[in-house]
């Protein structure tokens, strides 16, 4: 089974009396960012061999690199050079090409991503401006919480 299919349906845990949370760290990429990446990629429907490029400081990039690898997509991640070596290692492990910009210069990372897209060399999730990012959480998390509420009781 493909890992990206396993995104979501994370456990609900009780944090304190009547306060519950979703344990998003059990997603395949280890974070809640797996949800919007999968949701947006599913709607973009890129074909194997196509390139996806994103400016990111970490977790979205890791999720994207993982899912691109499984779908046969090329992945380019643009990020400031001061991001952790562990993140960079994970990105490369999943086969992503990494373009580093000056430390802390996230605006430049976005510019480079936009240049690659405008040159027709890749598509982007546009994670910061894409309404699907919010829709994903509203649709999927709401449904999971509604189902969990029914199973657990009044949460």
Which residues make up each language-model segment?
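PLP-dependent amino-acid enzyme catalytic core
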Residues: 1-155
